[in-house]
Amino acid sequence: MAQTSSSSSSTFEHLWSSLEPDSTYFDLPQPSQGTSEASGSEESNMDVFHLQGMAQFNLLSSAMDQMGSRAAPASPYTPEHAASAPTHSPYAQPSSTFDTMSPAPVIPSNTDYPGPHHFEVTFQQSSTAKSATWTYSPLLKKLYCQIAKTCPIQIKVSTPPPPGTAIRAMPVYKKAEHVTDIVKRCPNHELGRDFNEGQSAPASHLIRVEGNNLAQYVDDPVTGRQSVVVPYEPPQVGTEFTTILYNFMCNSSCVGGMNRRPILVIITLETRDGQVLGRRSFEGRICACPGRDRKADEDHYREQQALNESTTKNGAASKRAFKQSPPAIPALGTNVKKRRHGDEDMFYMHVRGRENFEILMKVKESLELMELVPQPLVDSYRQQQQQQLLQRPSHLQPPSYGPVLSPMNKVHGGVNKLPSVNQLVGQPPPHSSAAGPNLGPMGSGMLNSHGHSMPANGEMNGGHSSQTMVSGSHCTPPPPYHADPSLVSFLTGLGCPNCIECFTSQGLQSIYHLQNLTIEDLGALKVPDQYRMTIWRGLQDLKQSHDCGQQLLRSSSNAATISIGGSGELQRQRVMEAVHFRVRHTITIPNRGGAGAVTGPDEWADFGFDLPDCKSRKQPIKEEFTETESH
């Protein structure tokens, strides 16, 4: 017993000496004390030391464990971590923003990133017809679709992604001023019953997946972005694409929703923990007529591209356009190179409409081709044009008396509105020593250079309007001229515009075609009864004015027998206009000889249509002619 006690005492002393002194514990008693007392105290002190040492070890162990867990967490690839750490589903909502990172940043990236698996998003060949429910424009990278219609999107990868990979579709606004806003449906579609009843997708989500029960609709707790996630499925045998059917549940023009703001659809290939393996994006437009909108956008894009290319190509020249003065007009005999000095200055003009653009392009090409023509040839062409302009008054009416008046306007216009013969001819009468003092404008205008009187033709009407008067005793047909549109003016002046179609349907285009019509003929033309008598009376008045003009023409030609020498020959077009003028008007003259007096033919030579005394004491010319003179 004593031997055992001594061995235990020596062991304790050896252990005690190996420990460092600590002020926490009291000193052991001296060995001079009794054996039994010392042994009892040593055992008691040893028991206290043992308990206090175990308590500090446990406290240190727990503290080390906590520090170790904070400083060096277990590796996620160790089997211990895989067995102990819980596996979070990519579709499960996080319980705290600190436990799980957000699946997307505040402003998602829309940059294409094929990634290690060469991630691609493609579309099937689509139609541009107006009846198409969706169509994709590779030129614009833009999807056009109708609301709630199926839009198949093809997913392709070169190598299989890791297990648990998912495909996320997220809408974001395209413009920088709207990119922080969340793309949601408008309140009208969100709260309505259409497309919402019996659907598992939240009503506020714009993008839905059709025909996939594994689709999860995610509302990010940090950014608030809405997206739809589906597990990646490898392509079936014989295909290289994985097709996902998407639906877009709100129009781009909806007020309170997208409100005509363009959006981008970002398709990402993600791992289980949210790592992006690939990214593709395209613009989306939800509208009523995808084919029409695609065609309009592509046409506008091509026009804008052509304008931008032209601006970029000639940008340096356009900067000098306002600094340099326009080139001077080239002198005669200069070569083409000198004439084109300054042509590098470019100017631009915006044109609305394809037709206007093509017209201006023709003008531009004509100007460029003109620069290639030698200057002497251009001068010769301009001289020919000026000569034609000098001769044009013989073919066209001078602007002093305006367009040709219709017969009814001339009949009802009165003498005070008639132009003079000088105005019709376009120049004053030619002077000649043989011309007498009483030869007025009318007489000089009716004479020819050979001294012969102008032949009178009583049938100078619309049907025989090709006849004219030239120098000599014969007549040659003048050049053709435009059809007389006086039929419309005639019927409109009578208050019968509704009857125009009755005549034009039968090929009657001129007023002269109606002169020989009777009231029975008007009935055969299906003219209404209330207009027949009015039209027939108007035709009778027109005939009377025509007969009076022919009588005046004969009298004037018989009285004016003085020859006009030199080059006083009238051109056929001028005479033709004067004939039309005299035939179509009722001319009144003053009563020269009093009542019942017989007037000689020579007394009519000094009268012209523009004399002021023609307005006084008007009397029809028919009453002034005797029977012998009229024949």
From Swiss-Prot:
There is a cross-link at K622 (Glycyl lysine isopeptide (Lys-Gly) (interchain with G-Cter in SUMO)). Residues 479-545 form the SAM domain. InterPro entries: p53-like_TF_DNA-bd_sf (IPR008967), p53/RUNT-type_TF_DNA-bd_sf (IPR012346), p53_DNA-bd (IPR011615), p53_tetramer_sf (IPR036674), p53_tetrameristn (IPR010991), p53_tumour_suppressor (IPR002117), SAM (IPR001660), SAM/pointed_sf (IPR013761). Residues 30-43, 86-100, 306-315 have a biased composition (Polar residues). Possesses an acidic transactivation domain, a central DNA binding domain and a C-terminal oligomerization domain that binds to the ABL1 tyrosine kinase SH3 domain. The PPxY motif mediates interaction with WWOX. Belongs to the p53 family. Found in a complex with p53/TP53 and CABLES1. The C-terminal oligomerization domain binds to the ABL1 tyrosine kinase SH3 domain. Interacts with HECW2, HIPK2, RANBP9 and WWOX. Interacts (via SAM domain) with FBXO45 (via B30.2/SPRY domain). Interacts with YAP1 (phosphorylated form). Interacts with HCK (via SH3 domain); this inhibits TP73 activity and degradation. Interacts (via SAM domain) with NQO1; this interaction is NADH-dependent, stabilizes TP73 in response to oxidative stress and protects it from ubiquitin-independent degradation by the 20S proteasome. This is Tumor protein p73.
